[in-house]
Amino acid sequence: MTLDLNFLNYIYNKMISIKQINEKDIDLCYELDSKTISLWSKKQWANEFKKEGTKIFGLLFTNLIIGICVFQVVLDEAQINYFVVNKKFRKKGFGSYLMSYLIKNCEKLNLKKILLEVSQGNVTAERFYSRFDFSTVGIRKNYYKDGSHALLKEKKLITK
């Protein structure tokens, strides 16, 4: 018996989806955050859902949220405030899938660029963002609680 690769790709693509998530998903967002980078409290998550211009996308594998991207649109720019993939699903293309979706979404909105901050010591994240043509445009010294610097990254978008 041979497996049809097109059929397998079809099944795989049916298992992965991205949807805009809302305030009712706070507990799921907080849970994923707690298991990964522990960046925000539940209150901070609640505040993100209320910010004007903020969009929150969840990357789902079957019905499990395995990735989250939070970005805020201000004028003609998008600021990524949060981007994470569940540790069990890293280095399997899920983060790239979510980032590609974000970039296409921003291009459809005719935004000119995407901005983000990343810890200078987070080499894995830096490599990830460089694959999507984010370049370093600045630095915020001693930005994080541990004294590490934040690199300001920017990706220029192709608009019509």
Set out the residue ranges of the language-model regions.
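Conserved catalytic core of the tyrosine transesterase superfamily
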Residues: 113, 119, 154-157
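Short glycine/proline-centered loop/turn elements that form peptide/ligand docking sites
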Residues: 95, 99, 122-125, 142-147
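Terminal substrate-recognition subdomain of acyl/acetyltransferases
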Residues: 2-11, 149-160
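Active-site acidic-Proline motif in GNAT/NAT acetyltransferases
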Residues: 86-92, 120-122
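Acetyl-CoA-dependent GNAT
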Residues: 11, 16, 20-88, 99-101, ...
